[in-house]
């Protein structure tokens, strides 16, 4: 696939203490914002230009006001497409997810432990560098699963890290990985090639109808490291159209666990295993039989 090469963004700048960064990231993720840079006394958040309007701005202010008691001042600036690689490479270091996984920058050498699985990532603006707790939680859950014969779909693939990890954990079937952001889909294609893994199909899919058409092809495991609002919308869809599939999800805050339990009960899923890190959780769920 060949997504567009030019992707303009809106940069939101929050001048806050660094000890609040993780909390702000958690809160802003509920608005579907997944791309951040941390600077001294300033948190930068990025979203596609096409998603920014007065309604989105007011929604963010309302969420911050409800969370913190007041809406902190932030600025919004237009950012033309540029060399995001240089931006990210200035901040990224290798990330040891566990004794099994090491995420590194592409084309750089690191000391690797025996039997450690290395994933090389060129993140650009895509989500899934290993720096966010949700990515680490998903990978730790995946380590414990027998993926060899699973037919896997990765929803909101970002950098493609989860699809790549599934292949490196021994999955033998074609994997479908898709995102609704053009730069993310493009980035995932690059990372799949960088890691020399075969049979990972990366697609730019924006409409729910396209997802449903693919779900009907009989997937065994759905990977969904996305935000609460999207999960609320698509989990019932997955339940209807992939009635036998397990779902491994993250992007849910710990304090939203009651919401998740209520949703799973309503759509007839059982929770197999939940793990936690910081303010985040990851849950492996499956249909009740």
UniProtKB/Swiss-Prot annotation:
<dbReference type="InterPro" id="IPR050078">
    <property type="entry name" value="Ribosomal_L11_MeTrfase_PrmA"/>
</dbReference>
<protein>
    <recommendedName>
        <fullName>Ribosomal protein L11 methyltransferase</fullName>
        <ecNumber>2.1.1.-</ecNumber>
    </recommendedName>
</protein>
<feature type="binding site">
    <location>
        <position position="179"/>
    </location>
    <ligand>
        <name>S-adenosyl-L-methionine</name>
    </ligand>
</feature>
<dbReference type="GO" id="GO:0032259">
    <property type="term" value="P:methylation"/>
</dbReference>
<keyword id="KW-0489">Methyltransferase</keyword>
<feature type="binding site">
    <location>
        <position position="225"/>
    </location>
    <ligand>
        <name>S-adenosyl-L-methionine</name>
    </ligand>
</feature>
<comment type="similarity">
    <text>Belongs to the methyltransferase superfamily. PrmA family.</text>
</comment>
<keyword id="KW-0949">S-adenosyl-L-methionine</keyword>
<feature type="binding site">
    <location>
        <position position="135"/>
    </location>
    <ligand>
        <name>S-adenosyl-L-methionine</name>
    </ligand>
</feature>
<dbReference type="GO" id="GO:0005737">
    <property type="term" value="C:cytoplasm"/>
</dbReference>
<dbReference type="InterPro" id="IPR004498">
    <property type="entry name" value="Ribosomal_PrmA_MeTrfase"/>
</dbReference>
<feature type="binding site">
    <location>
        <position position="156"/>
    </location>
    <ligand>
        <name>S-adenosyl-L-methionine</name>
    </ligand>
</feature>
<dbReference type="GO" id="GO:0016279">
    <property type="term" value="F:protein-lysine N-methyltransferase activity"/>
</dbReference>
<keyword id="KW-0808">Transferase</keyword>
<dbReference type="Pfam" id="PF06325">
    <property type="entry name" value="PrmA"/>
</dbReference>
<comment type="function">
    <text>Methylates ribosomal protein L11.</text>
</comment>
<keyword id="KW-0963">Cytoplasm</keyword>
<dbReference type="InterPro" id="IPR029063">
    <property type="entry name" value="SAM-dependent_MTases_sf"/>
</dbReference>
